Amino acid sequence: MRGLRPALSTFLFLLLITGGVYPLLTTALGQWWFPWQANGSLIREGDTVRGSALIGQNFTGNGYFHGRPSATAEMPYNPQASGGSNLAVSNPELDKQIAARVAELRAANPDASTNVPVELVTASASGLDNNITPQAAAWQIPRVAKARNLSVEQLTQLIAKYSQQPLVKYIGQPVVNIVELNLALDKLDE
């Protein structure tokens, strides 16, 4: 019985620290130092939440830039079904999916160059990716320009404006946030 008291007091102490103090402290510091990120990086227009800068959305119209394919269950970009979505490179089903996506993209983008960017035909590991390269966005310019009656130059400038450089120059590549880019396109129409 004497050994039970130190074990129980250690358990209660660690429960208090790991179950109360640590979560409250990290939440408070996150809200203090990074309030936008700690609250989901939500993109707001007035009182309306239009999306998150961290999670892609299913933009399908010709007047929008399309992101990476999402293979999440039930619906594209379903955050509750996030998980590995790509098949193994050796799987013949992956070849069929990529061929179908390439054919679909070429049909939707007849004025684009013939080389479809790889990130437009392969799903991300989470199925929720919101970023593509500026080159993949530029590949879609003819379709978006035609659908929105905008010039190639206007869209090129918009892509450049919403391109984000990696934190370290030689690690990573520039990306464009598709959600922010498409919301900016909608603002051009207003």
UniProtKB/Swiss-Prot annotation:
Protein's UniProt keywords contain Transmembrane: yes
Keywords, sorted A to Z: ATP-binding, Cell inner membrane, Cell membrane, Ion transport, Membrane, Nucleotide-binding, Potassium, Potassium transport, Transmembrane, Transmembrane helix, Transport
Statement: the UniProt record of this protein carries the keyword Ion transport: yes
Predominant localisation class: membrane
Recorded GO CC terms: plasma membrane
TM region(s), chain numbering: 10-30
GO MF term (any one): P-type potassium transmembrane transporter activity
Localization per Swiss-Prot or TrEMBL: Cell inner membrane
Membrane disposition: Single-pass membrane protein
InterPro entries registered for this protein in UniProt: KdpC (IPR003820)
Free-text function comment from the UniProt entry: Part of the high-affinity ATP-driven potassium transport (or Kdp) system, which catalyzes the hydrolysis of ATP coupled with the electrogenic transport of potassium into the cytoplasm. This subunit acts as a catalytic chaperone that increases the ATP-binding affinity of the ATP-hydrolyzing subunit KdpB by the formation of a transient KdpB/KdpC/ATP ternary complex.
Subunit structure: The system is composed of three essential subunits: KdpA, KdpB and KdpC.
This protein's name: Potassium-transporting ATPase KdpC subunit
Organism of derivation: Escherichia coli O127:H6 (strain E2348/69 / EPEC)
Organism ancestry: Bacteria, Pseudomonadati, Pseudomonadota, Gammaproteobacteria, Enterobacterales
